C-alpha cells in the first residue's frame, strides 16, 4: 500500500478545506494521496447547469473551493463523474468522497464507494436496526431512505447541512 497511488475524488472542487487535515495525515503516513474534484475544470456557468430541476429526485450536495455549497442533479453530474474517474485509471485506488448510491452506475475495478462500505458495515454490526440519518437537504430524504431500506433498516431522516450548520435544523 505504501507505493500505491490513491486518488481522493470529491463531487465538488478540490482541495476541500474540510478534509485537508485527514488527507495530510494520510500523506504523513507515507501514502501517495492526490485530490481531485469532479467540478475542478468547470466554469461557474457550467456548474449552474448541473443544478437539479424540480423533476430531479436524486440531488447531491457538495462544496466549491470558495466555500459555497451547491446542489447538483446526480443525473446531470454522472457524465462528469465518469470522465473524472476514467482520467484517473492509472491510480491504484480511487475513493469517491460521496455517500450517494453509485453502485449500479459506476464500475471501475479500483473504485471505493463510501456508500457501499457504510451500508454493509452497519448491516454487519446489526441486522435489524432503526437508524437516524442526517443529510444536507430535505429533498434527499427519499433517496437516502430508499437506499437504507433496501438494506432492511428502519430509517428516520433529518436535514442539516454540514456546510451551513444550523443547530435549529437538528432540534
Residue ranges of each PLM-predicted region?
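Flexible, charged surface loops at secondary-structure boundaries
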Residues: 1-2, 85-92, 106-107, 123-129, ...
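N-terminal glycine-rich anion-binding loop in soluble enzyme alpha/beta folds
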Residues: 2-71, 135-166
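Periplasmic-binding protein-like
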Residues: 7-9, 92-97, 132
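Short, well-ordered alpha-helical microsegments
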Residues: 16-17, 96, 102-105, 118-120, ...
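N-terminal glycine-rich phosphate/adenylate-binding segment common to multiple enzyme folds
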Residues: 71-116
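A short, acidic, amphipathic alpha-helical segment used as a generic capping/interface helix at domain edges
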Residues: 79-84, 164-171
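Short, charged beta->alpha transition segments
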Residues: 82-87, 117-124, 143-145
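Anion-binding alpha/beta catalytic cores of soluble intermediary-metabolism enzymes, centered on
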Residues: 104-134
Amino acid at each position: 500500500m505504501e507505493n500505491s497511488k490513491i486518488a481522493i475524488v470529491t463531487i465538488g472542487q478540490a482541495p476541500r478545506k474540510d478534509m485537508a487535515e485527514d488527507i495530510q495525515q494520510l500523506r504523513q503516513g507515507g501514502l501517495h494521496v492526490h485530490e481531485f474534484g469532479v467540478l475542478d475544470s468547470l466554469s461557474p456557468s457550467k456548474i449552474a447547469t448541473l443544478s437539479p430541476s424540480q423533476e430531479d429526485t436524486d440531488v447531491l450536495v457538495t462544496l466549491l473551493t470558495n466555500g459555497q455549497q451547491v446542489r447538483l442533479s446526480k443525473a446531470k453530474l454522472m457524465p462528469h463523474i465518469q470522465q473524472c474517474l476514467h482520467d484517473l485509471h492509472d491510480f491504484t485506488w480511487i475513493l469517491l468522497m460521496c455517500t450517494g448510491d453509485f453502485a449500479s452506475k459506476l464500475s471501475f475495478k479500483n473504485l471505493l464507494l463510501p456508500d457501499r462500505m457504510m451500508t454493509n458495515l452497519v448491516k454487519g454490526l446489526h441486522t435489524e436496526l432503526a437508524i437516524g440519518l442526517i443529510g444536507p437537504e430535505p429533498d434527499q430524504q427519499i433517496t437516502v431512505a430508499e437506499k437504507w431500506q433496501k438494506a432492511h433498516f428502519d430509517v428516520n431522516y433529518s436535514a442539516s447541512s454540514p456546510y451551513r450548520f444550523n443547530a435549529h435544523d437538528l432540534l
